[in-house]
């Protein structure tokens, strides 16, 4: 198993920058505002042959007594509990603070191995500015610069050294079959994304707080159900323009879209009390454009009456007609109602998105469809469809070869899609059909 390293420290000491450096990503939002990271944020790090999991935490204030900061402190304690080792991050430029002492006392109480990293130490060659940090009682102080990549290798080697890690070459690679299904939970702010994942996980790992957009970043966590492994991704949701922290929220939009791109299946979560909004339609459109398998869940179904239920079902038909292939589920995340069928739909959507289709079967279905209903003539030419093969998965792509295929109508494409979907039981996934014509336009001229 990969060792787990938690990054802990007061707000704005550069934990997210260090996280990004260790994982070689931009997964954590970085900007000059205190308190940006409010949930535990997981990423994969690597040092030489050794891989490890890094947890980025919110700014730790052990004595926070109320509101979101209390929740952040709770998240940090849970991260330390999950970790094999803690990197305690302090700010070399600002120097030692009373808050650093409070965190040090809390870390000693929690009892995990700890390495002290003084971040923002670029240019401090003599180390005299780091002397005060020895008061914290964690031994050597390691000056690093996450922004410039200085001291990273030494820091990680020191953190991993006590763990006596086995040689990764001695461990067998995991079979592709056992790789987790990546599931993104996407939707507007405050539709219940974090509440749903928390219900599934049985712990409050994501901060589900009564503020629109509380989860600002895409958070990924492992999960298992009925023997199937999943990686659940809660996204920040898409914000209207003009909200607070606009620069951060714009970056979060990018992370939401990247989460959709990286997922195998997307659960599109709508709010029954608000109906289908323009933002919902935009998110749905992006999911379709990305080619991801999708399941639609209407949350807070218990909070609306029968008239509102009819209204939202009509709205889905009229505003999201391009997601007809997706199954629709009515749930209450907070009351745990209707969640079982959602899992079945997710599994079915993933199976459909990764379905393998043989060339002989595809070609047989194509020729049977043409025999049942020929494509319409376009001027002198009638499209001739000759054979088909699979061109990709997730989404499934079917490539049809023949002559004058540029004249195939949209209606006929929908007809073919319906035949293929029925034969292969493709539910919850887009199906892309591509046409490749012969170079000789006269080869298919009707006599």
UniProtKB/Swiss-Prot annotation:
Gene3D superfamilies on file? 3.30.300.20, P-loop containing nucleotide triphosphate hydrolases (3.40.50.300)
Name under which the protein is recorded: GTPase Der
In the UniProt record, the gene name given for this protein reads der
The entry lists its GO molecular-function terms as: GTP binding; ribosome binding
Positions binding GTP 1 in this chain are 9-16, 56-60, 119-122
The answer to keyword Flavoprotein applying to this record is no
Give the GO biological process terms: ribosome biogenesis
Positions of GTP 2 binding: 187-194, 234-238, 299-302
Q: Which residues form the KH-like domain?
A: 355-439
Subunit comment for this entry?
Answer: Associates with the 50S ribosomal subunit.
Listed InterPro entries: G_ENGA, GTP-bd, GTPase_Der, KH_dom-like, KH_dom-like_a/b, P-loop_NTPase, Small_GTP-bd
Pfam families membership: KH_dom-like (PF14714), MMR_HSR1 (PF01926)
The answer, when asked if Nucleotide-binding is one of the entry's keywords, is yes
NCBIfam families (alphabetical): GTPase_EngA (TIGR03594), small_GTP (TIGR00231)
SUPFAM superfamilies found in the cross-reference section: P-loop containing nucleoside triphosphate hydrolases
Species whose genome carries this gene: Variovorax paradoxus (strain S110)
Q: Which residues form the signal peptide?
A: none
Organism classification = Bacteria, Pseudomonadati, Pseudomonadota, Betaproteobacteria, Burkholderiales
In UniProt terms, what function does this protein have?
GTPase that plays an essential role in the late steps of ribosome biogenesis.
Family note = Belongs to the TRAFAC class TrmE-Era-EngA-EngB-Septin-like GTPase superfamily. EngA (Der) GTPase family.
